[in-house]
Amino acid sequence: MTDLIVIGGGLAGSEAAYQAAQRGLKVRLFEMRPSAQTGAHQTHDLAELVCSNSLGSNLPDRASGLLKNETRLLGSMLLECAEQASLPAGGALAVDRELFARLVTERIENHPTIEVVREEIKEIPDSPTIIASGPLTSPALSTSIAALSEEEHLFFFDAISPIVHADSINMEIAFRASRYGVHKGPSTTDFATSAQSSAQDEGDYINCPFTKEEYYTFVAALLQAQRIELRAFEDAIKSGVKAGHFFEGCLPVEIIAERGVDSLAFGPMRPVGLRDPRTGKRPYAVVQLRQDNLAGSLFNLVGFQTNLKFPEQKRVLRLIPGLENAEFLRYGQMHRNTFIASPKLLRPTLQHIHRDDLFFAGQITGVEGYMGNIATGLLAGINAAHLYHHEEPITLPQTTMLGALCHYVTHADLKDFQPMKANFGILPSLDFTSKIGKRERGAAYAERALADLESMILECRSLLLHNPTASLSDSREMT
């Protein structure tokens, strides 16, 4: 007998299944891959990271860092796996995407009360269910969701950055450095070699510096390059910038370049905090590459999502100084991301307004970012377990980052509803008696959030899987 069905083996679905199973439920986790493919995934593993390999900032006074500390406090399994697969990335948490997905898959498949079913769900079950099918929900299930909600789906377009082989990067031009000298340093894992550790001491990123002339030559080529022909259902992308069909954090570089010739230099190619060791000066612009696997043999172009045709990507991206002979493991590509009209359909508990036993989690709710997906999956799994045990589902305080995200996606103005990632702007404001800096404000919001979450945990011990006192202590140490 199954107590809960989870649809989707991505970040949210994997975390949701684990949280519910840890609380005594027998869970069937449905993942349609490999029998049905999405066009964006490369493997059959659960929790595959399709876009970047970064889970955002680790710093406790940043919004993403706070969300990590909240999910850590609540016992996130995926965050634990991410930290086991971590790579040097300055103040961010970047992972070896293959190792991360493998660790999650092993934890899920080896769990005694989780059954992984490799088949597509085409209709919403009438039993307790969490839908975490992600932005690439299959057409059949998407139709079923639309019929239940009597609401047309919303969407935006997302894009993937290219990945290059490290040994094809010209290190006579490119240089290792982290912005302002802030870097994580060598990985503590056994997979890292001493040679890689030595290189990481110089910085966690490889930087490709541009002169002003090189930058303008690159932008001109980028704007003239041919793009992948759009499929019929993606035709709205032609008016993407004006129509708002792109999530701002995932804009293709060619779309950013259309906004103005220097848009990239003030965006993903900004050179702040870096100096070219060949000149001793700050470059006019820079492309950063972040380590993509533990072996240090692959690097992705940070913030360089694109929808250029593959031969054009090879031609244009080889205009980047240091990448003139780059060999590409993966080219960039674009896909349509679907999400539901959550303000009209969901409660802050992530339950459907018309069905107590139907939950939604992850990017399909309009929460953006890997950590947001993990966190909403965690909450949906906890609340499904609460419902099973005849307990009230949890509504987290709006002063917490996860609580604020859930409140935002369920209370935003539907007319202007767009995906939202963790940021301090969605938290209730604090009254500061004097003017303080951004870092100090972030620290104050984080301190309040963790204090309020800890108070709620002490009142509701079922939120935690392990010893609450130990968990609270561990989280405080991270801050």
Predicted regions and their residues:
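Intrinsic-disorder-associated, low-complexity terminal segments enriched in Asp/Asn/His/Tyr and depleted
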Residues: 466-467, 474
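Predominantly flavin-linked oxidoreductase catalytic cores and closely associated redox partners
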Residues: 107-315
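Beta1/beta-strand and adjacent pyrophosphate-binding region of the FAD-binding site
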Residues: 1-12
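C-terminal auxiliary extensions adjacent to catalytic cores
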Residues: 420-465
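A conserved beta-strand/loop capping segment in the N-terminal third of enzymes
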Residues: 42, 58-105, 109-113
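N-terminal FAD cofactor-binding segment of flavoenzymes
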Residues: 18-80, 398-409
